[in-house]
Structures are given as C-alpha cells and as structure tokens.
C-alpha cells in the first residue's frame, strides 16, 4: 500500500501528462503502449547503429577509400568511443535546456542527417562531391629493403568521414543517454517490477536490432552494395523518428530540471586544490563553505545534498574507472576481431564449386561469401538466450540458495571472460600467422578487395565472440545495474552518463594503443602489406590487452571488496536513506 502512494506525488512543474482515457485499465494500457514505442525506437536505432559499425572497417579498407587496416580499425574505434564518450553531453543538454523528449527527437534528426553521409560516399559521384578525387596512387614507391622506414599513405577523405562519424557518435550517444531514462519514465507509475521488466526488454530490443542488422544489412554490404547496405540504416533512423513523433500523445514528458555538474566541479576543486578554491571564493566565504550554486531560489538540490551526492560519486567512480580496460577488450569485437576475420578463410554460401575457391566463385557470380560481421551474432545470440534464462531461472535459483553474487562480483567474473576472449584471439592469431609465414594462403575476394588469408576457417573465431558475449552479461548489465542502483535519484542521469562515457574512454584508449603500435617498429606497423595484417603481430597486441585486463581485474577486486565492506559497515544506513526512486 505505501508504494502506490509514493508514486502519486505531485508532478514536476511543467510536466506534460499524456491524453489518456480515464478508467481503471486505460492508464496501464497506454503506459505499456508508451513503453513499447520506446522499445521499438530503440530496436530501430540499434539496427542502424550496428548497420554502420558492423562493416565499417571493411568499408574503409575497400577500394572506395583504400585505407589501411590499421587506419580503418582506428576510425572504427574512434566512432565507437565517441558514441559512448559523448553521452554526458546529450544528458547535460537534456537536463539543462531541452528535456529528455526534445533531446531524443533532436538527436534522431541529427542521427538521420549524419548517417546519410555513408551512403552518399558509397558511389563515385557522391564521393567526389564530398571528398574530391582520390589520389592516383595511395601507395608510395616500394622500399628497397625490408627494414626501410615508410609511413602509411594519408587516408583519403579522412576529414569528412571523421567529422561525419563524430556527429553520428554524438547523435547515438545522446539517444543512448536519454532514451533509456525517458522510457523508464513511461512505466514508472506501474511499479518497480514494471521498471525492472522494462530494462530487461530494453536490453533485448538492443540485441534484437543488432540481430536484424547483422543478418540483413551486413550481408548486403559485403555481397551486394555498400550503397544499399548503408541506405538501410538511414531508413531505420527515419522510421524510428516517425514512430517517436507518432507516439507523442501517449508519452509523459518532463521539463529540464537543471544539472549538478557545476556543483560537482566546485566540490572537486575544493577537495583537490583547497588553496586555489579559497582564493577563488575569497569574496564570499559563506558561499565557499556551503558550496551553493548561483541559482535563483527554485527547486533543486540543497548544498548539503550536493555534498552527499559528491561523496557518493567519489565512492562509485573508482569502481567504474577500473572497468575501462574491460571496455578496451569489449570493443575489439567490432574492430580488430573483424580485421582478423577478413584474413581467415570465409566460406561461400551455396557454393557451386566443390573446391570452394572464393575468387573463382565470385567471378562466376555463383555464390555469396558469408559476411564476416555475422560472427557478431555469436555474441548477440548468447545475450538473447542467456539474459532471459538468467533472469527467470538462474538468478531466482541462486537467490533461494542465498548464493546470488552481487553486481560487483558479477562484474569481476565478466572481466575474467573478457580476458579469456582476447587470449583465445591471440592464440588463433598465432596459428594464423604460422600458416602465413609458411606461405599457406588462400586468396579471397570480399566486396571489391582481394585478401591473402590463412586456410583456417573463420568459424575458429566463434569461441572468442562467445566469450565476449558471456562477459557482456556479467560485466555490462551488472555495471548498468550498479550505476543506476547506487546513485541517488538526483544523480542517476549524471552517473549513467559517466558510465557510458567511461565505456567510450575504453574504446578511445584501444584506438590510441593501435595508433601507438602502428608507429615504425611497432607490432602493427606493416605498410608494405597494404590493406592486410599478414606482416603485423596482432597476436602480441591481443596478449598485451589480456595483460592489461588481468592487472586491472585484480585492482577491481580490491576496490570492489573495499566498497562492499564500506557498504556493510556503520555508514550503510546512509546508503539506504538516499532517495533512489
């Protein structure tokens, strides 16, 4: 009985309620309709996102742009990083100026415009309009000796593509940071169980969109046309925008409530640099003591609440920061794992020739090659199967036996599976290079590019994709749970934004590591092997990632242990006194 009363609190000034029929069942039915609309929008947006990322390395590495494998991998990691790193920007704009509804709508519009760049550059006239003419020869003169230094060719159309990918990353990150909370607002009145189920289905929608995109869009991009393949994500975003606008009458929309970013920065400055803070605030000692914002008297957090929220942030941040190396590992499946797969033997679908030689069959037009991006389905299918199984069967059983691990313990287990994934990838790369160095190769044409691949089947990559999928269940989902549940209500949006931002930091650090190792003398420096990785040492790169993950996993276990002991101590009563909604 008390819970329903708590949810009937006065509405926020400026909050718009949907035009719902009055009645016992009407509101519940329309709340579910609003939640379903959000799930459909998220599914279409994720289908578009994976449609962009699945073959981005292949697209940039193709004859359309002639980027090297290292350059294409770096661009993919930058885009993935931006799509997470910029999440606080969208959340801040929604909190301060736009509100979540308008932030999502405007983000989808930007998404639609930015995603149009990829199909626009997928045909010659469009490329020449945006990028100019490609240089006659992207390769320099041959090296007289194997050890002579030579830099990789400057990537064609890089400024335009990077600008478009960064705008696309900003749009995707803004949708990610606002649509999740906006959807939860729609079902919050139905109770806490409805909110929990919404998040389960929300994660399902993400992966369902990924499945549809990888099955259809990735196949079209690799075997038919990049123009058609990249036009489908544009259509998905357009349909998502239409559905979002069409469902407006059933949405609950809330006005912007302000941001606590300035308060947190002031508190950080006071704690880290007290002398500097005292000089800065000497004109107002009382302001320096209570850290009050220069706000007019309006609803918002009090100075005491700001201090309490800052203390929570200081406790949570070390836990989330130690997840960054996990994200470095996680994003390999959409960058270096793809590049590795392009240099393994990719079988044909419905081959007409028993010899199954890819180049000959492609020349005859008698079959299609299996899209390398389909291996991402191993990750997605694991999530689609194990999430409901874990939610409905495994977790309740462990709970009855009092063996259910905490979110932090699950995250540590997820790091272990991520570690094993890159170890498996490194071992496979060692075996692949063994065949390459003994001149045991097969030539295969993928899209318009000819690759010298090892005779190892691409199916050998399935274990590393399965392991990264299992790690996602134990690290990513509990990470979201931890960030949402440990934050006070007034900072849930900010802390979720920080969580996604740190995910992007992991991707960008992975990109920086690739760039560093691509310098002359680095493991990934192989300019004489244009477009390929056969003279690189990507196996050592994978083992380096595994070592970084192992060290930080041990650090995470220590930090998480301290956090849980502090939560169970005398101060734990304050944890439960915070308003988590």
From Swiss-Prot:
Residues 1-14 have a biased composition (Basic and acidic residues). GO terms for cellular component: endosome membrane; intracellular membrane-bounded organelle; lysosomal membrane. One of its GO terms (biological process) is peptidoglycan transport. Keywords: Endosome, Glycoprotein, Immunity, Innate immunity, Lysosome, Membrane, Peptide transport, Protein transport, Symport, Transmembrane, Transmembrane helix, Transport. Pfam families: PTR2 (PF00854). The chain crosses the membrane at residues 38-58, 76-96, 103-123, 155-175, 200-220, 232-252, 310-330, 369-389, 411-431, 458-478, 497-517, 540-560. Optimum pH is 5.5. Residues 1-26 are annotated as: Disordered. It catalyses: glycylglycylglycine(out) + n H(+)(out) = glycylglycylglycine(in) + n H(+)(in); carnosine(out) + n H(+)(out) = carnosine(in) + n H(+)(in); L-histidine(out) + n H(+)(out) = L-histidine(in) + n H(+)(in); N-acetyl-D-muramoyl-L-alanyl-D-isoglutamine(out) + n H(+)(out) = N-acetyl-D-muramoyl-L-alanyl-D-isoglutamine(in) + n H(+)(in). It is a multi-pass membrane protein. It is found in: Lysosome membrane; Endosome membrane. Proton-coupled amino-acid transporter that transports free histidine and certain di- and tripeptides, and is involved in innate immune response. Also able to transport carnosine. Involved in the detection of microbial pathogens by toll-like receptors (TLRs) and NOD-like receptors (NLRs), probably by mediating transport of bacterial peptidoglycans across the endolysosomal membrane: catalyzes the transport of certain bacterial peptidoglycans, such as muramyl dipeptide (MDP), the NOD2 ligand. Belongs to the major facilitator superfamily. Proton-dependent oligopeptide transporter (POT/PTR) (TC 2.A.17) family. This is Solute carrier family 15 member 3. It comes from Homo sapiens.
